[in-house]
Regions:
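Sec-dependent signal peptide recognition
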Residues: 2-10
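Hydrophobic h-region of N-terminal signal peptides that target proteins for export
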Residues: 10-18
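Solvent-exposed, acidic/flexible segments
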Residues: 22-23, 42-50, 76-84, 104-108, ...
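Short, functionally critical alpha-helical segments immediately adjacent to catalytic or ligand/cofactor-binding
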Residues: 22-37, 52, 87-88, 111-119
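N-terminal, post-signal-peptide region of Sec/Tat-exported proteins
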Residues: 41-67
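Alpha-helical segment that forms one wall of the substrate-binding/catalytic cleft
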Residues: 58-122, 137
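Short, low-complexity, polybasic intrinsically disordered segments
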Residues: 115, 123-143
């Protein structure tokens, strides 16, 4: 698997073992979502290699603003750093939601499930992984990555 995660994004996020694991998970999501195609456009208008929709992009952008990071307009979706920063912010929001319900260490499959079907969809499935989530989880575990 190639390593397309932006060096700029890693520097902005602070490179450590946890950030490396997050970057690896996001790369696995990108493989399953688009084959790591940064120019990909989904059937429902999702954009980039992580296939982020407009609403998730806007939510992630708000998070970046709150955290004091640069934010990225939807029109900049083709920019590699924008895609990586938005994806990382979206993943932090997903993790935060798990912590809020008392699950501080969700599995890669649970994180991928929420990425794929949204929080409400994942809750309605009781976080049981679908094929997409299992593919992401298997790919993640096949990578040599330092975990938390």
């Amino acid at each position: 698997m190639k390593r397309p995660f932006s060096i700029v994004a890693l520097l902005l996020l602070g490179f450590n073992a946890a950030a490396a694991a997050e970057a690896t998970l996001l790369e696995c999501i990108a493989v399953v979502e688009s084959g790591q195609n940064r120019k990909a456009v989904g059937k429902a208008g999702e954009r980039g290699m992580y296939q982020v929709g407009k609403a998730a992009w806007d939510d992630a952008n708000e998070r970046l603003k709150r955290e004091g990071h640069h934010h990225f307009q939807w029109s900049k979706w083709r920019d590699a750093t924008a895609q990586d920063m938005i994806a990382a912010a979206h993943l932090r929001t997903i993790r935060e939601n798990f912590k809020r319900i008392g699950k501080p260490d969700p599995s890669p499959e649970q994180l991928a499930l929420v990425w794929n079907v949204g929080w409400s969809g994942a809750v309605s499935r009781r976080f049981a992984p679908n094929d997409y989530a299992e593919r992401v989880g298997n790919l993640f575990r096949s990578q040599k990555v330092l975990t938390r």
